[in-house]
């Protein structure tokens, strides 16, 4: 027993001594970044952009691994189960980190407690858009029109639990709208049907709808942001349109719970370096996105955002009775 006790205590001591050493050497090999959505989507685009710059700051390659399914929760569950050594991190979004607990009764992670928060990666405001044939020209008239039509108007979204689904629930609830909700498999088909005149409207990330707005194939009423976007400067903000509605999608970087603090701090520093990079800022502007600033950066800023978004979104989802079994 004495020998076993000695080995056990010695092993614990060795682990305790090795943890700081591992943190000092970190990273000594490539880092896997789990993106819980398909390649080419908004989260994937941002992950690759920021990951490349973070890799330069850290002196190692960040390798994106796309693990889609179950509204992004499959990939985030994989991240929770990874070793807390800093070599597997993930980029979730508003859906996986705020809406998921209300949508998935059997969710295998708690966004507020199951991760070591690294930081907010970007914000992308929602844009209110419709098919060209809708007989409205401004946001107030649009809301009044949709309200008057009830379920005779269709709302297209990218699937249950998607950003456009959640944003639509919040928007529709705030203004008393009761459209017929039509789920699609992704944003692309929604916009294709909108251009074809088969879907009346959606509230989606500006990143997704900027090409159609510029091409003039859909109507744009407003962006739900405090300021206009430089990529679509003619589209007013919701405030300018006389409507009180601010809503941004966001992406966030997390690591498995119990990742050493020193390693998290290195990831935070690398993320901030990436967000301050002029090339990243320029690309964000093209995408209609922006980086967090000041106190919104880092683990505390992300934790505050997750907590506030869960509080905002949960009542709306529960009232709508939406569940994913």
Predicted stretch roles:
Residues 110-120, 178-182, 200-201, 210-246, ...:
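Short beta-strand->loop
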Residues 28-30, 261-325:
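An extracytoplasmic/periplasmic, membrane-proximal ligand-sensing/linker region
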Residues 1-5:
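Positively charged n-region of N-terminal signal peptides that target proteins for export
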Residues 23-113, 152, 176-205, 212, ...:
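N-terminal (or domain-start) structured segment
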Residues 7-18:
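Bacterial N-terminal signal peptides
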Residues 81-87, 102-189, 240-243, 250-283:
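Hinge/capping helix and adjacent helix->loop/strand transition within the periplasmic-binding protein
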């Amino acid at each position: 027993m004495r020998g076993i006790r000695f080995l056990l205590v010695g092993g614990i001591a060795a682990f305790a001594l090795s943890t700081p050493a591992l943190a000092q050497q970190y990273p000594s090999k490539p880092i896997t970044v789990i993106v819980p959505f398909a390649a080419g989507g908004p989260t994937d685009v941002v992950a690759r952009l920021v990951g490349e710059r973070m890799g330069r700051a850290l002196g190692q390659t960040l390798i994106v691994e796309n693990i889609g399914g179950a509204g992004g929760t499959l990939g985030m569950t994989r991240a929770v189960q990874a070793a807390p050594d800093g070599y597997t991190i993930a980029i979730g979004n508003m859906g996986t980190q705020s809406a998921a607990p209300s949508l998935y009764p059997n969710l295998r992670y708690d966004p507020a407690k199951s991760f070591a928060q690294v930081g907010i990666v970007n914000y992308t405001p929602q844009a209110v858009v419709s098919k060209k044939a809708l007989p409205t020209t401004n946001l107030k008239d649009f809301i009044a029109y949709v309200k008057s039509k009830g379920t005779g108007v269709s709302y297209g979204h990218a699937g249950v639990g998607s950003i456009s689904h959640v944003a639509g629930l919040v928007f529709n609830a705030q203004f008393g709208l009761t459209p017929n909700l039509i789920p699609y498999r992704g944003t692309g088909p929604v916009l294709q049907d909108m251009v074809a005149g088969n879907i009346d409207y959606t509230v989606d990330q500006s990143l997704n709808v900027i090409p159609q707005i510029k091409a003039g194939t859909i109507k744009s009423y407003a962006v739900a942001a405090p300021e206009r976007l430089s990529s679509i400067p003619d589209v007013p903000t919701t405030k300018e349109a006389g409507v009180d509605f601010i809503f941004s999608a966001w992406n966030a970087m997390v690591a498995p719970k119990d990742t050493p603090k020193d390693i998290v701090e290195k990831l935070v520093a690398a993320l901030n370096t990436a967000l301050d990079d002029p090339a990243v800022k320029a690309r964000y502007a093209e995408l209609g996105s922006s980086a967090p600033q000041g106190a919104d950066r880092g683990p505390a800023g992300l934790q505050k955002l997750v907590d506030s978004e869960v509080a905002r979104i949960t009542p709306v989802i529960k009232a709508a009775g939406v569940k994913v079994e």
